[in-house]
């Protein structure tokens, strides 16, 4: 990989991991437009580590409160808001784990085409627009129940289909359940932690069993750039989402999907 490829791919990973615009749609663009080869498993692990560190550091206060509350009262009848939120993250993670193990082979075999990614980018983008426009948007993250957490988790399982966007579909589900935009985004970001961690561990196991030739300079640069871009993305998104809404991201997804379709049928 050249330095230009490392920089572009790491920044793409950091930004698209948390914006509702589909990371897989963007990661396929360099190969479609520029003919770049796959970045390799080791680099994929490195940029995911950068993204994971970014979200964990940004939400370190929330994570600390949730862990303290969960270990303190998570198994008692006197639940606190933070202990319940910890449970909701756990519950919402379970469907992705189940469907991830059950459907991984099928998805990798049949759902990673540019056509599938283009269609899901457009289709789930329109669903995001509908949720943002029609939902009540008046509930706080602490108003969630185990049922709403499970619904968001089921939605997250759909993100195994490339082009769906994990953050996009979980925010869509949160909005449809009546969460305000910031709460939907915060829960989506908290939910990303176990998912990215799990995906990173699986990729690491694959890497150990079939090791690539490792370019440590590329991995370090990729991880750092992914961390910086992901942290900035989370900060700016939460600062602006209540004011700008989801429409800019929906429009962007429509354009991106159309571009991919043009290349598919060109």
From Swiss-Prot:
Q: Topology with regard to the membrane?
A: Multi-pass membrane protein
What is the protein name stated in its UniProt record?
A: Undecaprenyl-diphosphatase
Q: What protein family is recorded?
A: Belongs to the UppP family.
Q: Which GO terms describe its molecular function?
A: undecaprenyl-diphosphatase activity
- Entry's transmembrane regions: 1-21, 39-59, 87-107, 111-131, 150-172, 187-207, 218-238, 244-264
* Gene Ontology cellular component terms for the protein in this record: plasma membrane
Q: What taxonomic lineage is listed for the species of origin? A: Bacteria, Pseudomonadati, Pseudomonadota, Gammaproteobacteria, Alteromonadales
Q: What else is known?
A: Bacitracin is thought to be involved in the inhibition of peptidoglycan synthesis by sequestering undecaprenyl diphosphate, thereby reducing the pool of lipid carrier available.
Q: Where does it mainly reside?
A: membrane
List UniProt keywords, sorted A-Z: Antibiotic resistance, Cell inner membrane, Cell membrane, Cell shape, Cell wall biogenesis/degradation, Hydrolase, Membrane, Peptidoglycan synthesis, Transmembrane, Transmembrane helix
Question: What is this enzyme's class at the first EC digit?
Answer: hydrolase
